[in-house]
UniProtKB/Swiss-Prot annotation:
InterPro entries: Hist_DNA-bd, Histone-like_DNA-bd_CS, IHF-like_DNA-bd_dom_sf, IHF_beta. Signal peptide: none annotated. HAMAP family: IHF_beta (MF_00381). One of its GO terms (biological process) is regulation of DNA-templated transcription. It comes from the Bacteria. It holds the Pfam family Bac_DNA_binding. Heterodimer of an alpha and a beta chain. This is Integration host factor subunit beta. PROSITE patterns: HISTONE_LIKE. GO terms for cellular component: chromosome; cytosol.
Length: 94
């Protein structure tokens, strides 16, 4: 599912809301999560999971084409840990 499909699904479930309003709400949620992560904060959605950032230290990598050693800078990467309820639902016997 892509973002536009998510917006459409939410709009279909809530016919009292305009599609544009649903799109604005979804964008606002993603913007807030992104901003919190950019500030180094953790975003927890109980039962669903938690978004956080982790540091990947600088390292020496290798160019796969030439075999030459390449310095890879340290960077921050997004990380998602699933919540217990989500894991249980995904692994439930149906």
């Amino acid at each position: 599912m892509i973002k536009s499909e998510l917006v459409q699904t939410i709009a279909n479930r809530n016919p009292h809301l305009f599609l544009r309003d649903v799109e604005n709400i979804v964008n606002a949620i993603f913007d807030e999560i992104t901003e919190a992560l950019a500030q180094g904060n953790r975003v927890e959605l109980r039962g669903f999971g938690a978004f956080s950032v982790k540091n990947r230290p600088a390292r020496t990598g290798r160019n796969p084409r030439t075999g030459e050693s390449v310095h890879v800078e340290e960077k921050w990467v997004p990380f998602f840990k699933t919540g217990k309820e989500l894991r249980e639902r995904l692994n439930a016997d149906e």
